[in-house]
Design a protein with these regions (language model features):
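Structural/interface elements that position substrates and couple domains in central-metabolism enzymes
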Residues: 1-234
Length: 234
């Protein structure tokens, strides 16, 4: 997808990596050197020399570090629909091995990784969390279509299920993140940070939209107001 592809392309420039998607048509497209989302150019795809693509789950058995970037939509009642996350966790559980690390990037509520995803991994794999396998959370900050803010120059929050795994996850992301990383003290802190980021942006947009309606009735140029207000330092 538009979140996972830029990430896996960058990793493919550094280490052997498998880009997995359940849709064979998408895999065939990427193998041909094209990306219909236009997030990654044919030239960038070609530069990722250690990247392979697959829709075959068995091809993930040789992997030891998994990054999950599935969407988290809402249902008809406007509640988080974690079905894609659960299904992805079930798939990984089938190929999970001793010592593997699973990192989630999808937007979730604080606690979701450990409450919803980890139990699925344990049930399907038969392995024990923080004994046989480990987890992390590193919220995606991709802005689709933005050619200025790319994967490598956006600071990345990382976290892990133990202090040692947190260090390891941070090291892995630092392979590709030129802007640096911020290692959160826990998975829940990283999850909560993502919620705050999204909430702050939505609240700001809603506030300005409301103010713009008022300014319009007062014949005041909203853009001029924002430019003036933006001169304050805090």
């Amino acid at each position: 997808g538009y979140v996972g592809l830029p990430r896996v392309v960058e990793f493919g420039k550094k280490v052997p990596v498998v880009g997995f998607d359940i849709h064979q048509k998408r895999i065939d497209e990427l193998k041909s050197g094209q990306d219909h989302t236009l997030e990654v150019s044919p030239e960038e795809l070609a530069q990722s020399t250690q990247l392979t693509y697959s829709a075959n789950l068995d091809d993930l058995k040789s992997c030891n570090f998994f990054i999950v970037t599935v969407p988290t939509p809402i249902d008809e009642y406007k509640q988080p629909d974690l079905t894609p996350l659960v299904k992805a966790s079930e798939s990984i559980g089938r190929v999970l091995s001793q010592g593997d690390v699973v990192v989630y990037e999808s937007t979730v509520y604080p606690g979701a990784t450990e409450e919803k995803c980890i139990p699925v991994l344990e049930r399907v794999s038969g392995l024990k969390f923080n004994q046989d396998f480990y987890a992390g959370y590193s919220p995606e900050r991709i802005n689709p279509g933005d050619k200025l803010h790319r994967v490598t120059n956006i600071l990345k929050i990382t976290s892990g299920s133990t202090p040692e795994i947190a260090d390891y996850v941070d090291e892995v992301y630092n392979l590709i993140i030129e802007a640096g990383t911020h290692k959160a003290p826990s998975i829940k802190v990283a999850e909560a940070a993502k919620v705050i980021e999204n909430t702050q942006r939505d609240v700001n947009i809603a506030l300005i939209n409301e103010l713009a309606l008022i300014f319009n009735k007062m014949n005041i140029d909203t853009e001029a107001v924002l430019q003036a207000a933006g001169t304050k330092w805090n």
